[in-house]
Amino acid sequence: MSPKSRYRMHSQLDNVNTARRGSVEEREPVWMNPADAQVRGLKNGDVVLVKCRRGACLCGLQVSDRIKPGVVSIQHGAWFEPENTPAGRIDVHGNANTIAIDVITSKIARGNVSSTGNVEVSLWKDEVPPVRIFNQPRRVNAVK
């Protein structure tokens, strides 16, 4: 499940401090029920891999009984930052679009479907890649 964030408008404002509330090592949080976390050997603050057949992303785990068992939640809006990792090319910042279903509701309506899908969440055991998406680009002087 991927709801909209109350701290940003889609991906706008992802680089402001309020959008980083609840983040873990500057990664978008994935919310999980305590029972599901326990079964997987996960704890609050872990960096986890969220994956499905469409893609994968790294998130910071937030454990909460406000999430129904069997469900995880990643809010929309984290900026996309793909990196080559031991698990393949994945988003390291927690962009929910990497795992969301990308189909239209019908040929007539062309609306979006609910941002849901089947994912698996596991502990990230490799070195945690740095989040660089907020860094300023390297300055390049114009050629005269």
Residue ranges and their predicted role:
Residues 1-15:
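C-terminal accessory/binding modules appended to enzymatic or scaffolding proteins
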